[in-house]
Amino acid sequence: MFTVAIHDMVERIGTWLDDQIDGATIFGPSRFGKSSAVDHWLQRLLSERYGGYVPLVVWSHTDSGSATAVGRFYAHLLEASGHRLAQARRSPLERQTMLVERWIELAAQGGGRFLVLVIDEAQGMSQREWLWLVELHSLLEKQRIRLCVFSIASLQFFDEPLGMALAGGAHVAARFMLASAPFHGVRTVDELAYVMRGYDEGSEWPAGSGCSFTAGLAPRPWAGGFRMADQAEALMLAMQDALPPRYAGPVDFPMKTVAHACRHVLLRVASGADVDSETSATAWQAAVENGGHRTLMALVSATAALRGAGRRESGHA
């Protein structure tokens, strides 16, 4: 489902591209919908924004292993770039050459002199992997190709640029980590209603039927006026009520919870269960709790509390 956060992420990345930023970070808690935004929306929305194909490689980070595994690092990027010989036996130098040539080819397909690399799960990147990426960036620069690296990372990654600089990787931080922006969850009832309206209007099931998810799955309730968007306030209250005690994180709710709860309730209604019963406050609370919402938000709270404590210690130092 499309969200305000996805729109904001695409607009932010578009602005960074316009400003010729070499690298930046989108950060947010786990399960808030970052990977879904990258996998299902980023390419199409960037292409719409620029009125044509945008050369984009999305790599969900996989650890390359030991410090000598640069060849495996290149193989992972070759596979993400759609190279047909990504897994063929080659020396690290040969793989590096193949990768640079592939990226030059993709940049040319975009009709420009730039390529976008999106690294999902970037919090797992090691310093040596960042250094290997710097080398690739430099090789492309010599070919007059601008490589723009956007990292999609978990919340704790926010402090990584300073940590990288202090660890001797200032040139990495300066090249790829000078800008950052948060990826929010669902924050208001209006935002939630917008997302849930996607079940009513912005979807199709079965494919080619012309019916939305709600109409296709629950035709009788739909005919009787049932709409998922009308349930936004009830779901928001259920998510708020399920926050852990002394919650210290942002008032942002994950798309994982929203999708799980909506799917559960919609399928119950579709099965013939009583609509009023399945959309009661108690039913929404159960749907939220059973999706692991409280545990997930406890993790968000703990991370936020640790970051807050770290900032306070730094301020007293």
What are these regions (language model features)?
Residues 2, 25, 37, 44-48, ...:
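C-terminal alpha-helical "lid" subdomain
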Residues 5-12, 16, 67-120, 124-132, ...:
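Mid-core helix/loop region of P-loop NTP-binding domains shared across ATPases and GTPases
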Residues 17-43:
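Walker A/P-loop nucleotide-binding motif
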Residues 25-30, 125-129, 140-167:
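Sensor-1/coupling segment of RecA-like P-loop NTPase cores
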Residues 32, 62-66, 154-159, 186-190:
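Conserved nucleotide-binding/hydrolysis micro-motifs of P-loop NTPases
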Residues 80-81, 186-187, 194-208:
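Conserved AAA+ ATPase "sensor/coupling" helix adjacent to the nucleotide-binding pocket
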Residues 163-185:
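A short helix-turn-beta junction within AAA+ P-loop NTPase domains corresponding to the substrate/partner-engaging
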